[in-house]
């Protein structure tokens, strides 16, 4: 296995680095979790070489610090990602993610009859795991969906 010592994406002075995102998931995280809702510079590395994963994605957001809750929501799609807080070009806090119990205002319920699709209410799901599978239970219609079904209903 090759050791990669070259910096693939430019370092940032201050902000957040989301590392070890599964390849092909980085852009989805930017969209679903509204990580681009800032005027700060965002650097994205896609399909970067990784000793552990083979390939990975990477997101760097300057001058933006994610809360623990925001970071943990990413675990739904990037369970082994790390969220690093950067100050003066150094990692000052490295956080591994924990799957949250619930998630709100991120995804739309796939059930076309769900009240959350027709009424001005915030969407919300309770997160359940079955083995390694992640399922989301809508807090309104109480239907349980595989993660992929919720993902598909949110593609534009």
Curated annotation (Swiss-Prot):
It comes from the Bacteria. Zn(2+) binds at residues 109, 114, 138, 141. GO terms for biological process: 'de novo' pyrimidine nucleobase biosynthetic process; pyrimidine nucleotide biosynthetic process. Binds 1 zinc ion per subunit. Its cofactor is Zn(2+). GO terms for molecular function: metal ion binding. Keywords: Metal-binding, Pyrimidine biosynthesis, Zinc. GO terms for cellular component: aspartate carbamoyltransferase complex. Involved in allosteric regulation of aspartate carbamoyltransferase. Belongs to the PyrI family. PANTHER family: ASPARTATE CARBAMOYLTRANSFERASE REGULATORY CHAIN. Contains catalytic and regulatory chains. This is Aspartate carbamoyltransferase regulatory chain. The gene is pyrI.
